[in-house]
Amino acid sequence: MSEEPVEIVNDALGYNVKYSLDSFLHDYNTQVTTYSGYPLFQEMESSSLDQLIKWNTARKIAYNGSILHFMRSMYQKKLKEEGFEIQFVIKKNDKETALKLKDFYGSVNYSMDDSINIVEITPNQNQVAIIYKDEESSPLYLEANPEASAKFQLSVVNFLPKESLAIEQNGYYYEQNDITI
């Protein structure tokens, strides 16, 4: 736990971020690191219209295909319209393959509680491939990951078995530690 917030200057997106770290854990057996805390984003100021446009463009690029974008799209049942596809990752004879899904929402047992505006999902499979088709992988990512596809972005999300994930309208989801990316 941090007594003072960590201060991050993100010149690329035009934000000063103060992050109050609540917990930081590393499991040496699984090699999984988790942390939690509270971020405070403050927009940088600029009198340059060109700089403001540059920041807004960079923010849109960072948002597109992000976990926040995905969760908001899932909540609104707009995965396909927003450029997402999900597939289940299954292991067969020590080989992983992707299983295309006809019904994204049925496969994750999507349910909306209108009284509290919460969506719950409980995927039928623990490993879910999230494909974002509306943006190609960046050249830097492809350089570091030569086996990756250049035509789309791919992330694999691991869900805890038989645990549901709650999603709020703003894209916040919990329990945060119930998934690993």
Tell where the protein language model's regions lie, with residue ranges.
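Surface-exposed, low-complexity/disordered segments
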Residues: 1-181
